[in-house]
Protein backbone atom coordinates (compact mmCIF):
# COMPACT_ATOMS: atom_id res chain seq x y z
CA UNK A 1 0.00 0.00 0.00
CA UNK A 2 1.23 3.50 -0.85
CA UNK A 3 0.34 6.68 1.02
CA UNK A 4 0.99 10.39 0.61
CA UNK A 5 0.84 12.53 3.74
CA UNK A 6 0.52 16.32 3.50
CA UNK A 7 2.29 18.06 6.37
CA UNK A 8 5.71 16.89 7.61
CA UNK A 9 5.44 18.94 10.80
CA UNK A 10 5.48 17.51 14.32
CA UNK A 11 1.97 16.01 14.11
CA UNK A 12 2.59 14.60 10.63
CA UNK A 13 5.85 12.93 11.63
CA UNK A 14 4.99 12.08 15.23
CA UNK A 15 1.45 10.81 14.81
CA UNK A 16 -0.15 9.99 11.44
CA UNK A 17 3.06 9.46 9.47
CA UNK A 18 4.43 7.23 12.23
CA UNK A 19 1.28 5.05 12.29
CA UNK A 20 1.35 4.67 8.50
CA UNK A 21 5.07 3.84 8.35
CA UNK A 22 4.79 1.47 11.33
CA UNK A 23 2.05 -0.38 9.41
CA UNK A 24 4.52 -1.08 6.59
CA UNK A 25 2.90 1.39 4.21
CA UNK A 26 5.18 3.00 1.62
CA UNK A 27 4.99 6.62 2.83
CA UNK A 28 5.88 9.92 1.19
CA UNK A 29 5.55 13.22 3.03
CA UNK A 30 4.59 16.41 1.17
CA UNK A 31 5.55 19.76 2.68
CA UNK A 32 6.85 23.24 1.84
CA UNK A 33 9.67 23.22 4.42
CA UNK A 34 12.77 22.52 2.32
CA UNK A 35 15.00 21.82 5.35
CA UNK A 36 12.66 19.03 6.49
CA UNK A 37 12.24 17.68 2.93
CA UNK A 38 16.01 17.55 2.38
CA UNK A 39 16.59 15.81 5.72
CA UNK A 40 13.88 13.20 5.04
CA UNK A 41 15.25 12.47 1.57
CA UNK A 42 18.83 12.25 2.83
CA UNK A 43 18.04 9.84 5.69
CA UNK A 44 14.64 8.30 4.91
CA UNK A 45 14.15 7.96 8.67
CA UNK A 46 13.70 9.97 11.87
CA UNK A 47 13.33 9.49 15.62
CA UNK A 48 10.18 9.86 17.70
CA UNK A 49 10.38 10.23 21.49
CA UNK A 50 7.25 8.64 22.96
CA UNK A 51 6.71 9.94 26.49
CA UNK A 52 4.29 8.95 29.25
CA UNK A 53 4.98 7.02 32.43
CA UNK A 54 8.25 6.09 30.73
CA UNK A 55 10.16 7.41 27.73
CA UNK A 56 11.11 5.40 24.67
CA UNK A 57 12.66 6.32 21.33
CA UNK A 58 11.18 4.82 18.15
CA UNK A 59 12.77 5.04 14.72
CA UNK A 60 10.47 5.59 11.75
CA UNK A 61 12.13 4.41 8.56
CA UNK A 62 11.55 3.90 4.84
CA UNK A 63 10.00 7.33 4.24
CA UNK A 64 10.42 9.78 1.36
CA UNK A 65 9.41 13.41 0.82
CA UNK A 66 8.31 15.74 -1.99
CA UNK A 67 7.44 19.42 -2.19
CA UNK A 68 3.70 19.99 -1.80
CA UNK A 69 3.91 22.54 -4.60
CA UNK A 70 5.05 21.03 -7.87
CA UNK A 71 4.56 18.13 -10.24
CA UNK A 72 5.87 15.35 -7.97
CA UNK A 73 2.95 15.62 -5.57
CA UNK A 74 0.46 15.61 -8.47
CA UNK A 75 2.09 12.47 -9.90
CA UNK A 76 1.88 10.73 -6.52
CA UNK A 77 -1.82 11.46 -6.06
CA UNK A 78 -2.39 9.71 -9.37
CA UNK A 79 -0.69 6.57 -8.01
CA UNK A 80 -1.20 6.16 -4.24
CA UNK A 81 -3.95 4.32 -2.32
CA UNK A 82 -4.26 6.74 0.58
CA UNK A 83 -3.81 10.50 1.07
CA UNK A 84 -3.72 11.91 4.61
CA UNK A 85 -3.22 15.45 5.92
CA UNK A 86 -2.03 17.15 9.10
CA UNK A 87 -1.59 20.71 7.89
CA UNK A 88 -3.96 22.73 10.09
CA UNK A 89 -7.55 23.67 9.21
CA UNK A 90 -6.59 26.88 7.38
CA UNK A 91 -4.16 25.13 5.01
CA UNK A 92 -6.66 22.54 3.69
CA UNK A 93 -7.93 25.03 1.12
CA UNK A 94 -4.35 25.69 -0.07
CA UNK A 95 -3.55 22.02 -0.77
CA UNK A 96 -6.88 21.35 -2.53
CA UNK A 97 -5.75 22.53 -6.02
CA UNK A 98 -2.79 20.10 -6.00
CA UNK A 99 -5.08 17.25 -4.92
CA UNK A 100 -7.55 18.19 -7.68
CA UNK A 101 -4.77 18.16 -10.30
CA UNK A 102 -3.63 14.74 -9.06
CA UNK A 103 -7.18 13.37 -9.29
CA UNK A 104 -7.51 14.66 -12.87
CA UNK A 105 -4.23 12.94 -13.73
CA UNK A 106 -5.45 9.74 -12.05
CA UNK A 107 -8.57 9.84 -14.24
CA UNK A 108 -6.49 10.51 -17.38
CA UNK A 109 -4.33 7.48 -16.54
CA UNK A 110 -7.51 5.39 -16.07
CA UNK A 111 -6.41 4.47 -12.55
CA UNK A 112 -9.72 3.27 -11.12
CA UNK A 113 -8.31 1.58 -8.02
CA UNK A 114 -9.94 3.19 -4.98
CA UNK A 115 -8.25 6.17 -3.36
CA UNK A 116 -9.21 7.34 0.12
CA UNK A 117 -8.41 10.80 1.46
CA UNK A 118 -8.41 11.45 5.22
CA UNK A 119 -7.87 14.90 6.72
CA UNK A 120 -6.47 14.41 10.23
CA UNK A 121 -7.12 17.87 11.58
CA UNK A 122 -8.32 19.35 14.84
CA UNK A 123 -11.75 20.15 13.41
CA UNK A 124 -15.16 18.61 12.93
CA UNK A 125 -15.56 16.72 9.61
CA UNK A 126 -12.40 18.26 8.17
CA UNK A 127 -12.30 15.86 5.22
CA UNK A 128 -15.80 16.92 4.17
CA UNK A 129 -14.55 20.52 4.14
CA UNK A 130 -11.46 19.49 2.17
CA UNK A 131 -13.72 17.68 -0.30
CA UNK A 132 -15.62 20.92 -0.89
CA UNK A 133 -12.37 22.75 -1.72
CA UNK A 134 -11.20 19.90 -3.99
CA UNK A 135 -14.53 19.76 -5.83
CA UNK A 136 -14.39 23.52 -6.39
CA UNK A 137 -10.94 23.11 -7.96
CA UNK A 138 -11.97 20.22 -10.27
CA UNK A 139 -13.15 20.66 -13.85
CA UNK A 140 -16.83 19.74 -14.28
CA UNK A 141 -16.06 16.65 -16.37
CA UNK A 142 -13.98 15.09 -13.56
CA UNK A 143 -16.43 15.49 -10.68
CA UNK A 144 -18.61 12.41 -11.26
CA UNK A 145 -15.48 10.24 -11.72
CA UNK A 146 -14.04 11.49 -8.43
CA UNK A 147 -17.33 10.84 -6.61
CA UNK A 148 -17.23 7.26 -7.88
CA UNK A 149 -13.59 6.37 -7.23
CA UNK A 150 -12.39 8.58 -4.36
CA UNK A 151 -13.47 8.25 -0.73
CA UNK A 152 -13.34 11.36 1.45
CA UNK A 153 -13.18 9.91 4.95
CA UNK A 154 -13.75 12.06 8.03
CA UNK A 155 -11.73 11.37 11.14
CA UNK A 156 -11.16 12.39 14.75
CA UNK A 157 -7.55 12.61 15.91
CA UNK A 158 -6.09 12.96 19.36
CA UNK A 159 -2.45 13.05 20.38
CA UNK A 160 -0.61 15.87 22.10
CA UNK A 161 2.49 16.75 20.07
CA UNK A 162 4.05 19.86 21.59
CA UNK A 163 6.76 21.80 19.76
CA UNK A 164 9.96 20.72 21.49
CA UNK A 165 13.52 21.77 20.83
CA UNK A 166 15.61 18.81 19.77
CA UNK A 167 18.61 18.23 22.01
CA UNK A 168 20.60 17.46 18.87
CA UNK A 169 19.18 20.27 16.69
CA UNK A 170 17.77 17.55 14.48
CA UNK A 171 14.97 19.06 12.34
CA UNK A 172 13.20 15.67 12.19
CA UNK A 173 13.26 14.60 15.84
CA UNK A 174 9.85 14.87 17.51
CA UNK A 175 8.31 14.21 20.94
CA UNK A 176 4.78 12.80 21.35
CA UNK A 177 2.72 11.49 24.25
CA UNK A 178 2.02 7.75 24.55
CA UNK A 179 -1.74 8.22 24.12
CA UNK A 180 -3.05 8.38 20.57
CA UNK A 181 -6.48 8.04 19.03
CA UNK A 182 -7.31 8.09 15.29
CA UNK A 183 -10.96 7.28 14.66
CA UNK A 184 -12.27 7.21 11.09
CA UNK A 185 -15.75 7.01 9.56
CA UNK A 186 -15.86 3.56 8.00
CA UNK A 187 -19.02 4.40 6.04
CA UNK A 188 -17.09 6.80 3.77
CA UNK A 189 -14.35 4.51 2.40
CA UNK A 190 -14.15 3.35 -1.21
CA UNK A 191 -13.01 -0.24 -1.64
CA UNK A 192 -11.83 -2.51 1.17
CA UNK A 193 -11.44 -1.08 4.66
CA UNK A 194 -7.75 -0.62 5.54
CA UNK A 195 -6.18 -2.51 8.43
CA UNK A 196 -3.80 -0.01 10.03
CA UNK A 197 -2.87 -0.56 13.70
CA UNK A 198 -3.78 2.61 15.61
CA UNK A 199 -6.62 3.50 13.22
CA UNK A 200 -10.04 2.76 14.71
CA UNK A 201 -13.07 2.34 12.43
CA UNK A 202 -16.53 3.50 13.51
CA UNK A 203 -19.96 4.08 12.00
CA UNK A 204 -20.75 6.75 14.62
CA UNK A 205 -17.93 9.24 14.14
CA UNK A 206 -19.74 12.31 15.47
CA UNK A 207 -20.01 10.76 18.93
CA UNK A 208 -16.21 10.45 19.06
CA UNK A 209 -15.57 13.82 17.40
CA UNK A 210 -17.67 15.54 20.05
CA UNK A 211 -16.26 13.39 22.87
CA UNK A 212 -12.78 14.61 21.99
CA UNK A 213 -13.82 18.22 21.29
CA UNK A 214 -15.90 18.48 24.49
CA UNK A 215 -13.32 16.80 26.73
CA UNK A 216 -9.71 17.02 25.55
CA UNK A 217 -10.07 20.28 23.59
CA UNK A 218 -12.42 21.95 26.08
CA UNK A 219 -10.24 20.95 29.03
CA UNK A 220 -6.97 21.87 27.30
CA UNK A 221 -8.23 25.34 26.32
CA UNK A 222 -9.66 26.14 29.76
CA UNK A 223 -6.44 24.94 31.42
CA UNK A 224 -4.49 27.28 29.13
CA UNK A 225 -6.72 30.32 29.66
CA UNK A 226 -6.95 29.97 33.45
CA UNK A 227 -3.24 29.08 33.57
CA UNK A 228 -2.28 32.21 31.64
CA UNK A 229 -4.40 34.38 33.96
CA UNK A 230 -2.75 32.80 37.00
CA UNK A 231 0.74 33.33 35.59
CA UNK A 232 1.57 29.68 34.89
CA UNK A 233 3.95 28.82 32.04
CA UNK A 234 2.91 25.29 31.09
CA UNK A 235 -0.23 23.16 30.98
CA UNK A 236 1.30 20.87 33.64
CA UNK A 237 1.90 23.82 36.01
CA UNK A 238 -1.66 25.02 35.44
CA UNK A 239 -3.41 21.67 35.98
CA UNK A 240 -1.42 21.07 39.19
CA UNK A 241 -2.98 24.30 40.54
CA UNK A 242 -5.92 22.93 42.56
CA UNK A 243 -8.22 25.88 41.83
CA UNK A 244 -7.69 25.54 38.07
CA UNK A 245 -7.96 21.75 38.18
CA UNK A 246 -11.35 21.98 39.90
CA UNK A 247 -12.76 24.26 37.18
CA UNK A 248 -11.26 22.22 34.32
CA UNK A 249 -12.54 18.92 35.73
CA UNK A 250 -15.92 20.54 36.41
CA UNK A 251 -16.14 21.88 32.85
CA UNK A 252 -15.30 18.45 31.40
CA UNK A 253 -17.97 16.89 33.61
CA UNK A 254 -20.51 19.47 32.42
CA UNK A 255 -19.69 18.86 28.76
CA UNK A 256 -19.61 15.12 29.54
CA UNK A 257 -23.19 15.26 30.81
CA UNK A 258 -24.17 16.59 27.36
CA UNK A 259 -22.33 13.70 25.63
CA UNK A 260 -23.98 11.11 27.88
CA UNK A 261 -27.42 12.57 27.09
CA UNK A 262 -26.76 12.94 23.36
CA UNK A 263 -24.87 9.74 22.50
CA UNK A 264 -25.52 7.38 25.41
CA UNK A 265 -21.89 7.16 26.53
CA UNK A 266 -21.47 5.12 29.71
CA UNK A 267 -21.13 7.55 32.67
CA UNK A 268 -18.44 5.53 34.50
CA UNK A 269 -16.37 5.05 31.34
CA UNK A 270 -16.65 8.75 30.57
CA UNK A 271 -15.51 9.65 34.10
CA UNK A 272 -12.47 7.41 33.53
CA UNK A 273 -11.82 9.13 30.17
CA UNK A 274 -11.83 12.52 31.97
CA UNK A 275 -9.33 11.20 34.54
CA UNK A 276 -7.11 9.91 31.73
CA UNK A 277 -7.14 13.36 30.10
CA UNK A 278 -6.27 15.11 33.37
CA UNK A 279 -3.33 12.69 33.61
CA UNK A 280 -2.24 13.61 30.10
CA UNK A 281 -2.23 17.31 31.02
CA UNK A 282 0.09 16.45 33.94
CA UNK A 283 2.62 14.64 31.73
CA UNK A 284 6.01 16.01 32.91
CA UNK A 285 7.64 15.24 29.56
CA UNK A 286 5.24 17.49 27.62
CA UNK A 287 6.45 21.04 28.13
CA UNK A 288 3.28 22.44 26.58
CA UNK A 289 3.10 26.23 26.81
CA UNK A 290 -0.21 27.79 27.90
CA UNK A 291 0.24 30.52 25.30
CA UNK A 292 0.53 27.97 22.48
CA UNK A 293 -2.54 26.03 23.60
CA UNK A 294 -4.57 29.22 24.09
CA UNK A 295 -3.83 30.81 20.73
CA UNK A 296 -6.60 31.70 18.26
CA UNK A 297 -9.20 32.58 20.93
CA UNK A 298 -11.67 33.90 18.33
CA UNK A 299 -11.82 30.47 16.69
CA UNK A 300 -12.00 28.74 20.06
CA UNK A 301 -14.90 30.99 21.14
CA UNK A 302 -16.87 30.43 17.91
CA UNK A 303 -20.24 28.64 17.91
CA UNK A 304 -19.02 25.23 16.69
CA UNK A 305 -15.87 25.01 18.79
CA UNK A 306 -14.68 23.69 22.15
CA UNK A 307 -16.18 26.27 24.53
CA UNK A 308 -19.48 27.43 23.07
CA UNK A 309 -20.62 24.13 21.52
CA UNK A 310 -20.70 22.23 24.83
CA UNK A 311 -22.32 25.27 26.47
CA UNK A 312 -25.09 25.16 23.84
CA UNK A 313 -25.52 21.47 24.68
CA UNK A 314 -26.05 22.29 28.37
CA UNK A 315 -28.74 24.80 27.34
CA UNK A 316 -30.36 22.22 25.04
CA UNK A 317 -30.67 19.66 27.84
CA UNK A 318 -31.13 22.06 30.76
CA UNK A 319 -27.83 21.05 32.40
CA UNK A 320 -25.45 23.07 34.65
CA UNK A 321 -22.58 25.00 33.03
CA UNK A 322 -20.93 27.12 35.74
CA UNK A 323 -17.40 25.86 35.00
CA UNK A 324 -17.78 26.18 31.22
CA UNK A 325 -18.78 29.82 31.81
CA UNK A 326 -15.58 30.32 33.87
CA UNK A 327 -13.57 28.93 30.95
CA UNK A 328 -15.30 31.23 28.45
CA UNK A 329 -14.65 34.25 30.69
CA UNK A 330 -10.97 33.28 30.99
CA UNK A 331 -10.73 32.93 27.19
CA UNK A 332 -12.04 36.49 26.83
CA UNK A 333 -9.07 37.62 28.96
CA UNK A 334 -6.48 35.85 26.76
CA UNK A 335 -3.74 38.23 25.61
CA UNK A 336 -0.68 37.33 23.56
CA UNK A 337 1.65 39.59 21.62
CA UNK A 338 2.34 36.78 19.16
CA UNK A 339 -1.30 35.99 18.34
CA UNK A 340 -3.25 38.27 15.97
CA UNK A 341 -6.56 36.76 17.16
CA UNK A 342 -5.74 37.63 20.78
CA UNK A 343 -5.10 41.22 19.71
CA UNK A 344 -8.31 41.32 17.69
CA UNK A 345 -10.23 39.95 20.69
CA UNK A 346 -8.80 42.65 22.98
CA UNK A 347 -9.66 45.37 20.44
CA UNK A 348 -13.21 44.06 20.04
CA UNK A 349 -13.82 44.01 23.80
CA UNK A 350 -12.32 47.51 24.16
CA UNK A 351 -14.50 48.79 21.32
CA UNK A 352 -17.84 47.09 22.00
CA UNK A 353 -17.63 45.95 25.60
CA UNK A 354 -17.59 42.29 26.71
CA UNK A 355 -21.31 41.64 26.19
CA UNK A 356 -21.53 42.69 22.53
CA UNK A 357 -18.06 41.29 21.77
CA UNK A 358 -18.89 37.81 23.12
CA UNK A 359 -22.22 37.80 21.27
CA UNK A 360 -20.48 38.72 18.00
CA UNK A 361 -17.73 36.10 18.36
CA UNK A 362 -19.88 33.23 19.65
CA UNK A 363 -23.22 33.81 17.93
CA UNK A 364 -24.94 33.77 21.34
CA UNK A 365 -27.79 36.24 21.91
CA UNK A 366 -26.32 39.36 23.54
CA UNK A 367 -29.36 39.60 25.83
CA UNK A 368 -29.31 35.93 26.89
CA UNK A 369 -28.77 34.79 30.44
CA UNK A 370 -25.60 32.85 29.54
CA UNK A 371 -23.93 35.90 28.01
CA UNK A 372 -24.81 37.83 31.16
CA UNK A 373 -23.31 35.00 33.27
CA UNK A 374 -20.12 35.03 31.17
CA UNK A 375 -19.78 38.82 31.40
CA UNK A 376 -20.22 38.68 35.20
CA UNK A 377 -17.52 35.98 35.42
CA UNK A 378 -15.28 37.99 33.04
CA UNK A 379 -15.57 41.13 35.18
CA UNK A 380 -14.91 39.14 38.36
CA UNK A 381 -11.56 38.06 36.87
CA UNK A 382 -10.35 41.61 36.23
From Swiss-Prot:
N6-acetyllysine: residues bearing it: 269
Domain of life: Bacteria
GO BP terms in the entry: mannitol catabolic process
Catalytic reactions of this protein: D-mannitol 1-phosphate + NAD(+) = beta-D-fructose 6-phosphate + NADH + H(+)
A Gene Ontology term for the protein's cellular component: cytosol
Swiss-Prot/TrEMBL keywords: Acetylation, NAD, Oxidoreductase
Positions of NAD(+) binding: 3-14
EC number in record: 1.1.1.17
Key word Zinc-finger present: no
One Pfam family it belongs to: Mannitol_dh
GO molecular function list: mannitol-1-phosphate 5-dehydrogenase activity
NCBIfam families noted in UniProt: PRK02318.1-2 (NF002646), PRK02318.1-3 (NF002647), PRK02318.1-4 (NF002648), PRK02318.2-2 (NF002650), PRK02318.2-5 (NF002652)
UniProt similarity note: Belongs to the mannitol dehydrogenase family.
PANTHER family membership: ALTRONATE OXIDOREDUCTASE-RELATED, MANNITOL-1-PHOSPHATE 5-DEHYDROGENASE
Protein name in UniProt: Mannitol-1-phosphate 5-dehydrogenase
Species the sequence originates in: Escherichia coli O9:H4 (strain HS)
Amino acid sequence: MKALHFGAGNIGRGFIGKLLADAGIQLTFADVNQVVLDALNARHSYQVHVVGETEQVDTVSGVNAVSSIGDDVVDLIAQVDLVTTAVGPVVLERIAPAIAKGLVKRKEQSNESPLNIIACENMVRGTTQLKGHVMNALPEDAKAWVEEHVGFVDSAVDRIVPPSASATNDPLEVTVETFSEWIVDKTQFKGALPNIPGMELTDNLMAFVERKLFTLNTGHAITAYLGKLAGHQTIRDAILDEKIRAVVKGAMEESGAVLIKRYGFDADKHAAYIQKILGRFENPYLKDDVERVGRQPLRKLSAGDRLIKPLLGTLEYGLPHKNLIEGIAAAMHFRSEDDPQAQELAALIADKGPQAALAQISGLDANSEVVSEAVTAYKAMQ
